[in-house]
From Swiss-Prot:
Residues 29-149 form the MTTase N-terminal domain. Catalyzes the methylthiolation of N6-(dimethylallyl)adenosine (i(6)A), leading to the formation of 2-methylthio-N6-(dimethylallyl)adenosine (ms(2)i(6)A) at position 37 in tRNAs that read codons beginning with uridine. One of its GO terms (molecular function) is N6-isopentenyladenosine methylthiotransferase activity. It catalyses: N(6)-dimethylallyladenosine(37) in tRNA + (sulfur carrier)-SH + AH2 + 2 S-adenosyl-L-methionine = 2-methylsulfanyl-N(6)-dimethylallyladenosine(37) in tRNA + (sulfur carrier)-H + 5'-deoxyadenosine + L-methionine + A + S-adenosyl-L-homocysteine + 2 H(+). The gene is miaB. This is tRNA-2-methylthio-N(6)-dimethylallyladenosine synthase. Residues 404-474 form the TRAM domain. It comes from Bifidobacterium longum (strain DJO10A). The keyword Iron applies. GO terms for cellular component: cytosol.
């Protein structure tokens, strides 16, 4: 896609596209994948890329993307927010402008919106070549062949999972960090959520298969894995083993070469002491936790069908921090859920003050078609926006105060990249410390410059609003060291 047709997110997504020795050869076609939404979609896009490469397609270079020198554009969509359809059709429209320049370009649409609006997509956007659901990644090459042969849009969306996406080939976006899905789908019935409709009921992978995949990731160069699931800590409940997730975490601790393990997302109702103990006692399990609150009002939590209340939520946080005082805990909060009063909102603000999250993903409630909450009486937008702004201001204050506590401390950072156009002059690198905080590091003059995947221990010299800076003065006794 041309630069002037791309959003900032699209430009950033270029960096996630895999490249290999096939570049310069068109193979069956040069492709680019644009991903919207959550980490599971990022994981699925790696599988889409893997399936395409296994069938003779070649990932595009940055120059090919910028020059529209493409044979296939794939859009992996999200359905979580109300504007998901607008974003999808807007992106499909931009893809069509590329097709006007390259008439033979094929356009494929997958992901959660494809699962929901399969027929509408084909009817509304006749230039789309293929529509495939979340359970049909492996069908994409066949659909493209059929479209090429017939000239007609091909639609393949099934409700039953035939095989885990993780069993498909993968073209991983990162050499050092890997996504590993432990389950797909969700058994919860939150009244605001569309995920059970688009992803289906929860199905767990076999622990042995998960561990085999992790070992392969490490053999391929990964230093870090993130375990993925809509509700990771209900892993194993289907076979009657409520300790399966904590056992899996401990098993990750036995894998040689695996430096860091994270997971997302757990459900507070199923977060048990055995998981806390496994996190605290397994050295390579990072003390980072995304713990969705959604609301601090018990009345609203009940309306959301969230099977916990604010007191239980805060009690679990207390147990986590007692076991791991350094834990960084982030959250999700929905503002303006139908029926939310100012009193309900103030209860959310109170919980946020007590919880002191490291960060929060705050969302204005978006009604999703077919969910129970969409049929409830909605709150005026101006009221919701005012509450949203107040919550964001409170959380930003807490985040800044939390980051300030890192100043003067030594942190170990896994290097994931370099900063800006001047990185070769400033030797400034970036990465995340153990609890997930983003750290930008200035390499002191005369000290070794780390490569991506190296670990740097450095003294934090300044806390920003959303990240940390480490510009250590080695001569003054501040720390800087590199571990390969």
């Amino acid at each position: 896609m041309n630069e002037d047709m791309m959003t900032e997110a699209e430009r950033a997504s270029i960096a996630a596209d895999g490249t290999d020795g096939l570049l310069g050869k068109r193979g069956k076609g040069v492709f680019h994948i644009h991903t919207l939404g959550c980490q599971m979609n990022v994981h699925d896009s790696e599988r889409i890329a893997g399936v395409l490469e296994a069938n003779g397609y070649v990932p595009a270079t940055e120059d090919q993307i910028n020059d529209n020198d493409l044979d296939l554009l794939v859009l992996n969509t999200c359905a979580v927010r109300e504007n998901a359809a607008e974003r999808m059709y807007g992106t499909i429209g931009r893809f069509n402008r590329v097709k006007l320049v390259r008439p033979n370009l094929q356009i494929a649409v997958g992901g959660c919106m494809a699962q929901l609006d399969r027929k509408k997509i084909a009817d509304t956007a006749p230039w789309v070549s293929a529509v495939f659901g979340t359970k049909n990644i492996e069908d994409l090459p066949k659909l493209l062949d059929q479209n090429r042969a017939t000239g007609k849009a091909q639609v393949q969306v099934t409700e039953q999972l035939r095989q885990f996406p993780s069993q498909l080939p993968a073209a991983r976006a990162s050499r050092i960090s890997s996504w590993v899905a432990i389950s797909v789908g969700c058994n919860n019935t939150c009244t605001f959520c569309i995920v059970p409709t688009t992803r289906g009921k929860e199905k767990d992978r076999r622990p042995g298969d998960i561990l085999d995949e992790i070992r392969q990731c490490v053999a391929d160069g990964a230093k870090e894995v993130t375990l993925l699931g809509q509700n990771v800590n209900s892993f194993g409940y289907g076979i009657g083993d409520r300790y399966a997730f904590s056992k899996l975490l401990r098993a990750c601790g036995t894998i040689d070469g695996l430096e860091r393990v994270r997971f997302t997302s757990p459900h507070p109702a199923a977060f048990t002491d055995d998981v806390i103990a496994a996190m605290a006692e397994t050295p390579n399990i990072m003390h980072q936790l995304h713990f969705p609150l959604q609301s601090g009002s018990d009345r609203i939590l009940r309306a959301m069908r969230r099977s916990y209340r604010s007191a239980k939520f805060l009690d679990i946080l207390g147990r986590i921090r007692a076991a791991m005082p350094d834990a960084q805990i982030s959250t999700d909060i929905i503002v303006g859920f139908p029926g939310e009063t100012e009193e309900d909102f103030q209860q959310t603000m109170d919980v946020v003050r007590q919880a002191r999250f490291s960060s929060a993903f705050t969302f204005i409630y978006s009604p999703r078609p077919g969910t129970p909450a969409a049929a409830m009486e909605q709150i005026p937008r101006d009221v919701v926006q005012d509450r949203f702004d107040r919550l964001v201001a409170l959380q930003e204050q807490i985040t800044e105060e939390n980051l300030a506590t890192f100043e003067g401390r030594d942190v170990e950072v896994m290097i994931t990249g370099k900063l800006g156009k001047k990185d070769t002059d400033t030797h400034r690198v970036t990465g995340r410390e153990k609890t997930g905080v983003l750290v930008h590091i200035g390499v002191p003059e005369g000290e070794p410059v780390p490569e991506i995947g190296d670990f740097v221990t450095a003294t934090v010299t300044h806390a920003g609003r959303h990240n940390l800076l480490a510009d250590p003065d080695v001569a003054a006794g501040q720390t800087y060291s590199v571990r390969h």
